[in-house]
């Protein structure tokens, strides 16, 4: 896959899966051996995590603005401005996420290091694993 195609996959993940909390694209966007360095359980773990967030925190809203997408080889780095709201609390930050892709799918995902702390500011605690 070209770097432009890899960037398109990452953009779709951020804009659809994260912003819309939509797990229906996980099988299409993630490789079967997908590893997320924040959410345990691989692809199936992520598919369970998204609806868990929706049911546990019905007021939770994400708006992730992609500032830059930079690709080299099989890696894409995204500079993202995150805005989370939940139960009247808001948190905003800008950080980097890194993705490794193979055959048009995300194989590995290093979410921004401050994601868990940012979610905690709006009352959301991530599972450990």
Where are the regions a protein language model picked out?
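C-terminal and inter-domain tail/linker signature
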Residues: 1-129
């Amino acid at each position: 896959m070209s770097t432009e195609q890899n960037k398109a996959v990452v953009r779709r993940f951020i804009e659809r899966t994260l912003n819309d909390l939509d797990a229906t694209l996980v099988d299409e966007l993630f490789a079967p051996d997908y590893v997320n360095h924040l959410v345990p359980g691989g692809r199936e773990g992520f598919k369970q995590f998204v609806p868990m967030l929706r049911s546990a925190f019905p007021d939770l809203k994400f708006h992730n603005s992609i500032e830059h997408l930079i690709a080299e080889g099989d890696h894409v780095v995204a500079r993202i401005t995150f805005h989370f709201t939940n139960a009247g609390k808001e948190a905003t930050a800008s950080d980097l996420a890194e993705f490794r892709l193979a055959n048009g799918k995300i194989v590995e995902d290093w979410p921004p290091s401050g994601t868990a702390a940012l979610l905690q500011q709006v009352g959301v605690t991530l599972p450990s694993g």
